[in-house]
């Protein structure tokens, strides 16, 4: 756990979050941002960089896809930001699950 990381603090139960899924290695939470009707975050419980987590994205991708299908039957988008230029705001690796409306060409 990184004490400065809000996601690590959520995983440790030190910060509130609406947890939608959790297992031994990952968690899915409701994003506090609400740009589209469904904005969720899927992440490993272990603090990892985006590039490190994407090297082994199988389980997170599978669960994120399943939850996306369940919550956004009309379609959804999975996306991640890598680094400052891509507007990555948290160092803890995570995947955005976006949907619940027509997303257009460039949302997320």
Language model regions located:
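HIT superfamily nucleotide-processing domains
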Residues: 1-108
